[in-house]
Amino acid sequence: MLVRNRYLGELLKNSRSFSVLNSSVRSGHNKWSTIKHGKAKNDAERNKINNKFANQIAMSVKLGNGITDPSMNIRLATSIELANKNNVSKKVIENAIRKASGSSASGKDSNASELCVYEGMGPGGVAIVVEALTDNKNRTIGLIRSAFNKANGSMTPTLFFFDKKGYVTMVPPKMLDTEDKVLESVLEIQGIEDIAPVQEDAEDLECDTETETTGQTYEAVMEPADTNKVAALLKERGFHIRDLGIGYNAKPDMEVFVQGDETLEKLQKLTTALEDIDEVTSLYTNASNA
């Protein structure tokens, strides 16, 4: 996006050097250029969204032991629901499922994607773990290494900074309108190690306006092997499952407080560059806000 904006800026700057005699024609041309570049930008954003959701769907199939039936794979069902809410087309969803199962639209076998984990150290000594779903590991690791190098970071083991945990993000039914009621309702669910309210974006909260829920989002943490079981039990109790998966939580004694605006800006630039890689599905750091 930044490259495109700089390119458009150069076009606009150069247009001011043209003869004033051609101003009326140039005005129409510039309007068309603006519309054209605006459409290209929107198309690029849409493609980025489609790619991210397609990877999440494919990963849901992979982590669900290859089960492609949403009724039997709760993570896949949740991923498809999120994709639909973000206007991802049926074709994109179906292709993502085929990609994960190793077959193409024609029914022939294709190169199945693999789940890969990459480790690195970023600005300020921040440990980073990157998850990606890729059908070309050499290409993906090249892109990730390039992002680290440009930020003066390095690819080095960092998994020991984190605990691997399962998580379920959900919204309680309306009758559970306080945190105490929520905690009491999940006491009998075995496997939950911790549960707490989390802050969600306004756009995400709007997605639940049609459901009989409180609007407050909670996240439960458990061992990875218990994730699907816990999600199914929460759903039985009326919780709306927003997301679930397996991720990496920074160990409390391994968290790093990022000092200085310049370092923070460099770290943000690196994480953005990593997230912009199509194959990247998740990114975790041990940076602390405290």
From Swiss-Prot:
InterPro entries: Integrase-like_N, TACO1_YebC-like_2nd/3rd_dom, TACO1_YebC_N, Transcrip_reg_TACO1-like, Transcrip_reg_TACO1-like_dom3, YebC-like. Coiled coil: none annotated. Its main location: mitochondrion. One of its GO terms (cellular component) is matrix side of mitochondrial inner membrane. It is found in: Mitochondrion. Disulfide bonds: none annotated. GO terms for biological process: mitochondrial translation. It comes from the Eukaryota. Keywords: Mitochondrion. Present with 1780 molecules/cell in log phase SD medium. Belongs to the TACO1 family. This is Probable transcriptional regulatory protein HAH1. The lineage of its organism: Eukaryota, Fungi, Dikarya, Ascomycota, Saccharomycotina.
